[in-house]
Amino acid sequence: MKTKRLTKLLMASAIALASSATTVQAATTAVSASKASVAGTFTTGDKTFLLNGQPFVVKAAEVHYPRIPRPYWEHRIKMCRALGMNTLCLYVFWNIHEQQEGQFDFTGNNNVAEFCRLAQKNDMYVIVRPGPYVCAEWEMGGLPWWLLKKKDIRLRERDSYFMERVKIFEQKVGEQLKPLTIQNGGPIIMIQVENEYGSYGEDKPYVSEIRDCLRGIYGKELELFQCDWSSNFEKNGLDDLTWTMNFGTGANIDQQFRRLGELRPNAPKMCSEFWSGWFDKWGARHETRPAKDMVAGMDEMLSKGISFSLYMTHGGTSFGHWAGANSPGFAPDVTSYDYDAPINEYGQATPKFWELRTMMEKYDANGFALGGRKGSLPAVPKAPMPIITVPKFELKDFKPFVYGCDSIAKEGGLKTFEEMDFGWGSMIYGTELPEIPTRSVLTADIHDFAQFFINGKYVGKTDRVKNEKTITLPPVRRGDKLLIIVEGMGRINFGRAIKDFKGIVSDVAITAVMDNHEITWKPQLWLKIRIPDDYNSAVRALAAPADDREKDFAPNGRGYYRGYFTLKKVGDTFLNFETWGKGQVYVNGHAMGRIWSIGPQQTLYIPGCWLKKGKNEIIVLDVVGPREPVVWGQATPELNKLQLEKSNKHNAPGDRPDLNSATPATFSTGGGSATAKPGNGWQTFRFQAPQKGRHIAIEILSTQKDGDRTAIAELYLQGADGKRLSREPWTCKYADSEEDNGNHTLDKVFDLQESTYWQTEKSAAPPHLLVIDLGAVQTVTALEYLPRAEQGAPGSMKNFKVYMY
């Protein structure tokens, strides 16, 4: 009996010692990230990553150094450590480092090497994603605007000029980061090749050339990987690279890795972007995702030994003009990149943070379960600055918009921003009109926000967000002056539309009916005035003496406003701009970002590290003009207040087609209705004969589960050649039910994002009707349908009909 007890005691002691040894080993391995002089290894093993030869689960926090003021970098890194993360994941943004061709900047807030050194100082490894394309809801996906000065350039392809510039950029990044790879004693354990290329195209030779470029810079020993979605990763997967998946909270994780497991059963699994929330766009509600779904997904992955990078762990702010835009259509992103992440925009812990931290205590530093014990995570650091408020104050100094001019071209025809060697800001286009004694319609493709004036009087606007391309003009006399103020917003960062020129990108056609004949004029001579959106231009404008420019180019209220506020103590604050129109804000010389009264973002985050005791300066460039030029600082952000001219819903009664006498398309299976299968993944439904029409109407008769709200993640149509039709021209025509509070509107079925979805309102039962305008008459041979990505594919449609007209 005593022998058995002694044996049990010895076994228990051995287990405890082994557990202790494992914990010590994990701690030692993690701490080794801070030992810059010790070379290490990071490789793939049998179903696991190997750090210095030992199994290792990557628990990465995605953070972006340009979205965080440099004085706050270390605090944000410590916040990630306090969540139990062992790695930081970051993009390298080409266009912030090479804003003008050949001029590289890796200093100050662009010092990516210093950010990596701070990670190592705080016992964290680093995964680097150097593009060249990064997406990230960032201007042009990180590609520099000046590439578009070569109008025929083929972006993200083996275009000779594009690849030449890519290799120069990657070499410059390598000079900064190669000394910091794990083989050289640094924290960098992996480098990503390109980014989600399967969502862009299929071009293994291009992806291979990017791989070869990076391998030549960093050496054969450093682990290279590529990320994509489970639906498209095979398109460009290279045999000698590690493959990782990107998906969002709530996704069916086994389903996401199913195909990878079939192809590479012994490979480690990693979700390289596990989306904690989502990004916001102007004119739509603030995006949120449930904490419980995020935490449950991460817990499931850790329990199965699956590595991850939480995108975003801390989103930060797209300061200045760096916020991008989504596509199809044009959906510009707001300045805040809060992302509903566990660490909010201003670096504080959210309820998500605490729920996640509690779960992460179950796992050790290397990502392995502690067997029911609760581990000890690093302490949550104190915020570097307090939150302060600022009393309301008025911006009293004013100069009209045109005083910001830095270049005038008086000859020639229309030119885009890029043809004017102009990256960001606004342009004024001017021309003289012919005699048109009746009302006329002006048609033009303008990127992005245009305001029209005749002899200085405002006559209307077009907004690319709303796909507006026409405006009605009043009768005019010969010689009347037409002015068009065009503001360029963030360039598209996702999909084929990243080749996003700014300004007037087509002819301007003015059409009128006179004596029963339609007559069209296309003005050929245009004045072109550049108005940059940088701080120095704003200061010059406000200091310029008044002259006769005001007479011709001073649309009422549009221009530069300056004011001052005094602080007794410094801290972070949120300046409120809900009484303003649209434009840019500068505080003490720092470009804080875009504002737009439509919301949902009404405040800008102002870091205390960029403020000072005493007098602080603020300049607002408002291209529309404020209702009242006042600002105040509040203690919390306002990220979910819309001020729209009309609802985002697409349910105008006049847009609903009458299908009572219409004949639905016949499917290849026979009959005028089809039945979708339950479960996740793409499904294709072919028509018995090609269908023709400009509009497609989908009538959903039932869902897989009674009582479910109906939902669709993505739709594609196949053309006569069996290939997917471009969705760039598509617009929403009608939906009988949409949940706009959660941004589950009709446009989500063609937004190129498999994790977002259209969904009906809670009380709405089938049948439902969706109508999409394809932009032109199309021949359609099949419909592709993707249900929601969550377990069980909630809201999946079952029986449905399709009409084209």
Residues of each region from the PLM?
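N-terminal carbohydrate-binding accessory modules
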Residues: 26-87, 117
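Active-site neighborhood of glycoside hydrolase catalytic domains
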Residues: 162-238
